[in-house]
Amino acid sequence: MIERGKYQSLTMVNWNGFFARTFDIDGLVTTLSGGNGAGKSTTMAAFITALIPDQSLLHFRNTTEAGSSQASRDKGLYGKLQPGACYAALDVVNSRNQRLLFAVKLQQVAGRDKKVDIKPFVIQGLPSHVKPTDVLIESVSATQARVRQINEVKESVAQYEGVQFKSFSSIVDYHAQMFEFGVIPKKLRNSSDRSKFYRLIEASLYGGISSAITRSLRDYLLPQNGGVKKAFQDMESALRENRMTLEAIKTTQADRDLFKHLITESTNYVAADYMRHANERHKKLEQSLSLRSELFSSRETLIEQNRLLNQVQQELEMLVESESALEQDYQGASDHLQLVQNALRQQEKIERYQEDLEELNERLEEQSMVVEEAQERVLMAEEQSTVAENEVDSLKTQLADYQQALDVQQTRALQYQQAVQALEKAKVLLSDSTLTAESAQALVAQLTQSEAEQTQALLALKHKLDMSSAAAQQFENALKLVHSIAGQVERAEASRHAKAAIQQARSAQQVVQNENQWRAQHRDLERSLNQQNQAQALVAEYQKAHQVTLDDEVMFEQERERHHAQLDSLEIALEENRELRSEQRRQEQDLQSDITQLQAIAPKWIAANDALEKLREQSGAELADSQSVMSQMQQVLEQEKQLSQAKDKLAERRSQLESEIERLASPGGSNDPRLKGLADTLGGVLLSEIYDDITIDDAPYFSAMYGPARHAIVVSDLSGIEEKLVELDDCPEDLYIIEGDVDAFDDSSIKAEELEGAVCVRLNDRQMRYSRFPVIPLFGRAAREQRLELLRSEREEVVEKHAKAAFDAQKMQRLFQAFNQFVAEHIQVAFAADPEQALVIARDKRNQLTRTLAELEAKELQMRSQIQNSKQALTMLDKLAPMMAVISDDTIGERFAELEEKIAQLADAKQFLGAHAKAVEQLESQLAVLDADPEQFDALEAQYQSADSQLQALKKQIFALSDLVERRHYFAYADSVDLLSKSSELSEQLKAKLVEAERARSRYRDELKQQQEQMNQYNQVLASLKSSYQAKLETVQEFKQELAEFGVSADEGALERAIRRRDELHERLHTSRSRKSEYERTLTSTELGMKELAKRLKKVQKEYVELRTFVVAAKAGWCSVLRLARENDVERRLHKRELAYLSAGELRSMSDKSLGALRLAVANNDDLRDALRLSEDNARPERKVLFYIAVYQHLRERIRQDIIHTDDPVEAIEEMEVELARLTEELTMRENRLAISSESVASIIKKTIQREQNRIRMLNQGLSNISFGQVKGVRLNVKVRESHEVLLNGLATQQEQHKDLFETARYTFSEAMAKLFQRVNPHIDMGQRSPQVLGEELLDYRNYLELSIEVNRGSDGWLQAESGALSTGEAIGTGQSILLMVVQSWEEESRRLRSKDIVPCRLLFLDEAARLDAKSISTLFELCDRLDMQLLIAAPENISPEKGTTYKLVRKVFKDHEHVHVVGLRGFGQEQKPKSEAQQMIEEFEA
């Protein structure tokens, strides 16, 4: 048994008097006891606010203003709250044992309206040990706490694993969550449902019989059965729509032939004119393009000739201007040549004298050298003579004294040894082991030179030191000279710059000396360079003309041979080109013949191809050849047969489903409609109606338990039934009758045992029945409705499949007919080659041939031009031949540039000498002054010491070497060592040496005399040469002065340049005159050609303008035609390719024939007739398209778009051909199936009424034993209104009488019911309601019932429950009973919407319970115990119930702070209910 959910506690945070209070809600009754103002109503207000957080409904008033509409502005909630965040939370444990905390956050909103901001939320899965205040309140200290904000509550909850926090933005979502978890009894979908729930809570709270509820008992107790009303409305709308659609189809069928005729003729009429205009426009465009091409080419030619004319005129003008300048230049060049020749003759004289001077100078220098050599020879002869004299004297002395000779030999031996020692010493000092006496003399010279340099440097430094103090002024003068030559320099760098200037002056003098040689070379190179430039100009001109560079003579010869070969090949190609042109013209004529033939074939092929493409699109097959067409045609036939069979099977299945749905929709779901009539005859009720409200889960069990008797009739008494049965004429073969109370049927008499998936029923001691649970139970309304839903879904699917199959079958039939027609008309042509493609190829070839012919003509002109160019090139090559030798010499330019640089240096040298010669000459004498800067004395002194030390070391080396050199003769005395041992031979050797020495002395004396005489002769010759040189030099100076007066450069180059310039100017003057004559001839011929071309251009332009004006005008109309056609999607209908091959006359004939047919077809339609009349204007082709659009628009309006879903009338008619047969049959069957009978309507309404009466009887059973004061029982009385009962009888039994209302198409079923209600109740005023509105009300069964509350009070018996006839306590008790009945009704009504394992909470309120006596309160306790309901009541202090939980509330005021003191008491007489296993486990866990 599923336990009912219970409210566990109510938590109030920050309410008036309640900062953080949790009230445990008792399982039965929770009593709030206290005096006035203790807070009882505030506590209930918090509970109700958490239950229904809708500020538009909440209105807490005391009992004194219960009936007042003018309550306080804040509706009793604003004043019950404290500032800041407030909470009201309901702790609930539902049937699934889930703990839920449904809470609302409240906060006062400042303002006059005293509104309260309410935000609902829920916390799910909070652990049992956590109190609601633990998450809503935060402890600040041991004595202080604060209220958390809602986001802080969310964060606080997040610390518990598995706990979910969810806030709600709408009350609907909050109540949906409450309903889902079983907190409220009914699903509150909208504000109306919330209002009903609040009115129920309010009526419970304030007690008594609520007029708001009693007046609307039908809305509270009777569920809305919208399915019946909706089913009737759907059937009505379907019937109405079917009838309208059927009428539209019939109308379309009647007009279809007219539409086809209208579309065909209008298409032929407009398309023929459309294509005729398109063809004409195409031809005109081709003509205009041809004229425009000719016009543009003529213009370009004229512009080119005009440009040529202007260019020739400009060049002629420039030529005339340059010719006069050339004449002047030529005369000047001739005069200049004469002057250069005079200067050259003068220069020749100077050169002859200079050659004499050079010769004299050379002789003078040679003679000076001869004199110097003679002097040297005289000196050498004198030295040799002196040495010989000394040797003779020495030998004579040695012979005179032998001992002296011996001493001399000893001395020489000693000298030899000293010489050897000197050699070793020199090797050590020089660190040279290879040193010898012979190399010592050369090394001495080197070191002596180095010594001289260092000595000179040392002396210079010494001189600088000596002069540094005394030569300051001299240094400044020398520095000024340096500044005048080299500019501003540093003092330290002055000496270096001075030396550099002196060196530069010397270099400049050398450069000036080479002037004549360089100028001669410059003249030769300039001549060669000019010749090379002239050749390069010719080469450049040749390259510009022929794009070939003549680099050398090999290339030159190759070009000459190439041009000769090209001339030969061009002559041959020119002949071949003529033959090729003839062949191309022949092919062009053949292609034109093929094009004409293809144009004749194309229309038939296009029609066949369109039909083939349509077949391919419809069938989805490739259809590559005729065999595939025949094969696909056979497949289509087979598919059509299969689809027809499938359609028939689906129609059969649909009929089965509809019959089953009709059976299940009948009262009781019986498969025999006679049972309902038998039940009425026997005065019973069908068993299926009694069990109509069982759940889906219980349906298999009860269906198996009753077995075949599930369609039995239940009667209150079996006596007399047999007699009635005998009198029956028509009844089922097996009829089961069961005796039992219809209002309280009990199945305890059936001995049934539930097995696994089955039921075993013992009929008697010897019989038993075993019935399995049906797979698809149909016992009970819920099971039948579930089955009906499945069957209806299947029926919809079957209907959809049947419609699709019928459509596909019709489509296949149409496709087979299309295949038949294609085979009969087009199959012979359709698979031939595409003539349009062949046409395109042929036209492309023809155009290609035309272009080829044009290219051949252009090629011929090009070849002639190339021949002319080759001839010109050969002429140019002949001119260039003599000059090719120098063109390949790349060094000329470099050498010329080098000489140019040298000549430039010459000019610089002359300029330098002219500017600084005197300064350099002065600087040479003062150069030593600059070596010692008086400002650098210390540096000079240190430099002097360093140089001195180096010089001393060098002197030591020189001394050693000089000693060695001085003693080198002693190495010849090596034999003296030997002579010392051979003294006898010494005398003889000395005598021999003396003789030899005397001969040498005589020879040297003779040579000295000769040399002296020769030197005197040389001196005389030198004096005469000096005298001749001085005379010649003076003459040359006079000649140079005369040459300078000429003012020209007198050299061979200047003469050649002058001659060359004169010749060039003469040649240019001759060329200019030739070109002038040529330009004048070109001007004349060009002007004549331009005149002829201008005449032709004017003619072509006139023709083009006229044709273009026509084309532009036609284009404007054609654009409007195209725009209209494209915007209205008719271009593909009008642009028929096959019409493009017809002539204009044929197209006009077709259009005229269709025009006649259209005049007859639209004679009765004013709009189309007017549009057709306007379209006959040939000057306005767009009007024909407008007529075609009007026809289409007319057809679109006539075709039902709700049946045929397409915008194209042609496609719509084609689709309608397929749909018409299927829809006609389908609509007829549907109309028969949807036909509504008045009897079935009455039966459905009666069945629904009876079901609700049975449900209310069951509700009354729960209230049968309730007593309050004198009231011993409470019940709900339900009965059918008399006027509506008369209506039901008229629907069920008087069908023939009211046939005029239900079998006419004038009224819908709702309107027919309204008319019948007026007919059977003429005394009732219907007011302003329309028949449709009244009929819809009559389809709602609740309008047939009247509900009232009756109480069994004392001796009065059952009477109407009214507050005036009952005491206060009795009224409160009666009201609570009624409310409990409503809650039960809501639970039953919502059972299907809620989960099966959820039983909702039941809780009601009662404020001011002191109005009930103790017995009444005890009755309430008993009612709560019996119906498992919780009750929250408020009572004064003098009421202390024995059961439940009682809270004593006392409001205390301490200074400015109010606090409600609460004491909770458990009822001392309360009996503990046995705890469930789950509760016991929970308590164990908590412990």
From Swiss-Prot:
Sequence segments annotated as region (Flexible hinge): 667-784
Keyword DNA-binding in record: yes
Record InterPro entries: MukB, MukB/SMC, MukB_hinge, MukB_hinge_sf, MukB_N_dom, P-loop_NTPase
Keyword Glycoprotein annotated: no
Gene Ontology molecular-function annotations: ATP binding; DNA binding
GO cellular component terms, A-Z: cytoplasm; nucleoid
Localization of this protein: Cytoplasm, Nucleoid
Coiled-coil regions, chain positions: 297-426, 460-666, 781-806, 836-1111, 1210-1266
Pfam families to which the protein is assigned, alphabetical: MukB, MukB_hinge, SbcC_Walker_B
Keyword tags: ATP-binding, Cell cycle, Cell division, Chromosome partition, Coiled coil, Cytoplasm, DNA condensation, DNA-binding, Nucleotide-binding
Residues noted as binding ATP in the record, renumbered to the chain: 34-41
Annotated GO biological process: cell division; chromosome condensation; chromosome segregation; DNA replication
Role, per record: Plays a central role in chromosome condensation, segregation and cell cycle progression. Functions as a homodimer, which is essential for chromosome partition. Involved in negative DNA supercoiling in vivo, and by this means organize and compact chromosomes. May achieve or facilitate chromosome segregation by condensation DNA from both sides of a centrally located replisome during cell division.
Comment block on domains: The hinge domain, which separates the large intramolecular coiled coil regions, allows the homodimerization, forming a V-shaped homodimer.
Assembly information from the UniProt record: Homodimerization via its hinge domain. Binds to DNA via its C-terminal region. Interacts, and probably forms a ternary complex, with MukE and MukF via its C-terminal region. The complex formation is stimulated by calcium or magnesium. Interacts with tubulin-related protein FtsZ.
Family of the protein in this entry: Belongs to the SMC family. MukB subfamily.
Record-given protein name: Chromosome partition protein MukB
Organism lineage string: Bacteria, Pseudomonadati, Pseudomonadota, Gammaproteobacteria, Vibrionales
